[in-house]
Amino acid sequence: MTLWPKRPIIYEINTRVWLNELTRKHQRPIELSCVPAGEWDAIAAWGFDAVWLMGVWERSLIGQHIARTTQGYLDDYRRALPDYTLDDVAGSPYCVHRYVVDAHFGGTRGLAAARSELAQRGLKLLLDFVPNHVAPDHPWVINHPEYFVQGSRDDLSRAPNDYFDTYGGHILARGRDPYFPPWPDVAQLNAFNPALRSAAIDTLNVIADQCDGVRCDMAMLMLNDVFDRTWSNRAGTRPNVEYWREVIPAVRGR
């Protein structure tokens, strides 16, 4: 593979939607390992430098339940797609249960096959990383609650939309942008926690082994100034080094 151009042209594909469309088009189940060669050829013919397969990671069942039962979301679906059904609602691709390729898409082997097809056509592969939050059923919630912004019983009583009970002895904050209400389907990671930063590096190394570049969702939320403004005294001691200045070199230099 050649080096990245200075200003790459990237084609985003909603992986779930695309595979469903191909399944209907070809009238057989299509996952990443068996996308017809002509489909890859058509993408390559457009002259892009890379393909971003958005949303390949395992989605959360809790997140899916929230997406299927929150009235405001249901109203939005109906306005956008009057004929939608609940089977169409898979949950947010940014509510990541685990950084494992979803079995519905062909799993790790399917992704490797897709990457190979792209490489044969001179295209690079981008995948997602969500540094700010994970799903409420991500293994870290139970195994490493210290990675998250913590709350108290009083916080939960005062602001039940801002916090949730893990039922493992911890109250955690829901993920958020400082200018909007919290997202109901994710848990807020603590960018100031050294152990979380180390775990993020490990996660990124796993992702990097499977692609040529990473698209980092809501990357600005991990900046010290932004995180401090959002979480102030709940985040602990502000580090001297920015999150990305610690994480990116560690992944690039491995």
Q: Where are each of the predicted segments found?
A:
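Active-site and adjacent substrate-binding regions of carbohydrate-active enzymes
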Residues: 1-254
